[in-house]
């Protein structure tokens, strides 16, 4: 028998698309249709070769929201996101890929084509095959169609960039924000070298003080702008206890886009400045400073 490894855009960090020696790679990049966006049922049916960001933009036009947004969202494919159970910055508030998958069309190794679930939010019949397939890296079958659930698009968001002279204090501030009762839609830690290399690598203009050792990139979202400002005030009060510097508030869409471009460009920037081996690691939030 010849081993077959399905693959999408090959942007993953854990090697899920690497073929077995003497095996074949099955590229799904040409299965790239958004079949349906069902606004009434808040669902979408897509093929696995659709680019994550293309899908996000398509549902956004209908005031709907698909939260999983890996750093590689501009190039990664939804089939790969399924295979790896991808997350992204918004996983903090909204969860990861598995939380939005309702149903999958899968070709099994036997050649049989099955649907793993149903296009409903609650299904109590039989095994939960959908969640078995998500994160299985293509080892159980080839996903050929995906049914996602969607949510209403938040109307407002605010983005903050917060400098710290001490990396450990920046890390400790993260848990303190949650203890204060605020759940940001995204919260990213960026250390000094990463942000300096990324500024050099991109066309983003940002002044970094010589004493700054780390930044927190924070986003809050919702439907009421007044409530978001209250969240930001609460976050600011927490951060001051950890001796943060002057907080940069993104005042326009372009400023927000630049800050997130900064975050999403870190991997490529670091690669261009060093001998770099990518890893995809997770640590408990409270242990981050260690």
Task: List the model feature ranges, each with a label.
Residues 1-290:
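Noncatalytic alpha-helical scaffold of FAD-dependent oxidoreductases
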């Amino acid at each position: 028998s010849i081993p077959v490894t399905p693959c999408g855009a090959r942007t993953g960090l854990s090697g899920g698309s690497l073929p077995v020696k003497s095996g074949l790679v099955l590229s799904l990049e040409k299965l790239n249709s958004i079949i349906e966006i069902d606004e009434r049922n808040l669902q979408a049916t897509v093929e696995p070769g659709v680019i994550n960001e293309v899908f996000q933009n398509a549902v956004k036009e209908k005031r709907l929201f698909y939260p999983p947004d890996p750093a590689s969202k501009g190039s990664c494919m939804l089939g790969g996101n399924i295979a790896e159970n991808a997350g992204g910055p918004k996983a903090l508030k909204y969860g990861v890929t598995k939380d939005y998958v309702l149903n999958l069309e899968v070709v099994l190794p036997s050649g049989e084509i099955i649907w793993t679930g149903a296009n409903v939010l609650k299904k109590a019949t039989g095994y939960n095959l959908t969640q078995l397939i998500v994160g299985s890296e293509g080892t159980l079958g080839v996903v050929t169609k995906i049914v996602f659930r969607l949510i209403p698009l938040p109307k407002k968001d605010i983005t903050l960039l917060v400098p710290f002279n001490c990396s450990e204090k920046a890390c400790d501030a993260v848990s303190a924000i949650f203890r204060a009762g605020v759940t940001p839609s995204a919260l990213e830690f960026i250390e000094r070298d990463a942000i300096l290399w990324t500024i050099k690598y991109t066309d983003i203009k940002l002044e970094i003080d010589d004493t700054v050792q780390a930044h927190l990139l924070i986003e809050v979202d919702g439907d009421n702008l007044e409530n978001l400002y209250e969240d930001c005030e609460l976050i600011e009060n927490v951060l001051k206890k950890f001796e943060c510097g002057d907080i940069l508030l993104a005042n326009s869409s372009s400023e927000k886009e630049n800050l997130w471009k900064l975050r999403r460009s870190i991997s490529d920037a670091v690669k261009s400045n060093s001998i770099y081996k990518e890893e995809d690691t997770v640590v408990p939030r409270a242990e981050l400073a260690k």
